[in-house]
Design a protein with these regions (language model features):
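ATP-dependent adenylation/pyrophosphate-handling site
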Residues: 1-44, 166, 172
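Structural beta-sheet core signal
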Residues: 3, 27-29, 62, 107, ...
Length: 217
């Protein structure tokens, strides 16, 4: 499976949950320079290294996401930005996963934790692509997730204050109950998005994560 690894505490816990069930996985991260920094990318690399004792050797794929994200920001209704961005990320992750012959995506989403994680928003997000989306944290609250992150050794890295692309351009009042019809209408008004997503998927950076890499931290 391919785990969507952000810089927060949720997605490393999701990876750990699936790895302990014996699922082999790789990670994918979305970077949007200059809005996100090199240090933010290195933070995610460090998280992947901290997880390697559970996941085994794997690859971190870093997606250059600036162009798709700017395009959505400039062409979509502000209140739908977050769900449209999540759909875009899943489509790119789907393309990368299928090239690797992986069978599912993993996210750290927790029900109703933020606006993009309501039932309505998740239903709209899932429809964007056709791989199963595994959400092992879906029924956990933030305290449970943080407690696990402390146990597995990712908490301190997760709280380092570096931005990630999920938090830039976030509207002040995102819609929590979007309908699929309005999401599809918004995407129909962005005919250039698919090409930008394909370009991003083709130009991923590969960072190989190996047992013993923690000695280099």
């Amino acid at each position: 499976a391919l785990n969507l690894l952000s810089g927060g505490s949720d997605s490393p816990v999701a990876a750990w949950c699936m790895a302990r069930r014996g699922l082999a996985l790789h990670h994918i991260h979305f970077a949007s320079p200059p809005y996100t920094s090199l240090r933010a990318k290195l933070k995610v690399r460090d998280l992947a290294r901290e997880l390697v004792e559970y996941t085994g050797n794997c690859t971190l794929f870093v997606v250059p996401y600036t162009k798709p994200q700017e395009y959505i920001r400039d062409n979509a209704p502000d209140v739908l930005f977050t769900v449209l961005m999540r759909r875009s990320m899943l489509r790119i992750a789907n393309q990368v996963a299928k090239k690797l012959e992986l069978q599912a995506l993993i996210t750290g989403e927790s029900l109703a934790q933020v606006a993009s994680q309501t039932m309505a928003a998740l239903a709209c997000t899932d429809q964007a692509q056709d791989l199963p989306v595994l959400r092992p944290c879906i029924g956990m609250d933030k305290i449970e997730i943080i407690n696990i992150s402390r146990k597995i050794g990712t908490f301190e890295t997760s709280i380092e204050p570096y931005e990630d692309c999920c938090t830039i351009f976030t509207p002040p009042h995102p819609k929590t109950n979007p309908t699929l019809d309005e999401i599809l209408a918004a995407e129909a008004a962005m005919p250039g998005l698919a090409a930008l997503e394909a370009e991003a998927a083709e130009n991923v950076e590969k960072i190989y994560i190996r047992m013993g890499d923690d000695e280099l931290l």
